[in-house]
Amino acid sequence: METLVVSKLNRGISTAKANRLLWLGRYAERVYLTLHMLRKHFDMMIDEDETAYVKFCTRMGIENKYSSADDFMKRKLFDSENPESVINMLERVKDNAILLREEIMTETLCYIELSIATMKNPAMQADGMAAMQQITDNILAFWGSIDERILNNEIRHTIKFGKYLESLELHMRFEYSLSRIKEIFDRLLHTIERDCYICEEITLLTMKEQLKLEKYPNKGLIYLVNSLANA
């Protein structure tokens, strides 16, 4: 996946903090949606095509370095040496959350720490995909805590901006319907209408026009998504 850096000083927060807030949102949403997509492909691997994980890797834009469906599921979920694993995504959320503890509150961070502890539990690892509902529930609670506990609008909106960027990219990669893409884009617009300094306005206008043309799926849209933050 392409990376994205926020380098413009925002009104009340530093460049470094803006980056951490945005990536906190992106990584948390990446965990949530990766698990969602994995469930669908896991069912396909059981019921239809045991090599469905190959298509998953292609759509995610990652290397297929797995020897089998079983190897894929184990390493994609629990392998701390695999930079694309869910456990590693959670560690990235945690790294940002620890540095932002004062902004997001300890209670919010606890949902991520609980998720990591769950992933490292041998009993949960033995259950595999069946145990991942707990992680999904924790991420939903994390987002609820973001909404409930963060009173600073600028901080909350920057995190949400990252969330919707990630949501747009992954839904595009997995070729969800144009109507679904537009729904997520509208949520992103709602966020940046409140704090428009977050967004690269020319790129935003280009993306609006592209969605109006309804030329989708379109790999160029993924590039635009990853160019939407001010650089």
Per-segment meaning from a language model:
Residues 2-231:
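Alpha-helical transmembrane segments and their helix-helix packing motifs
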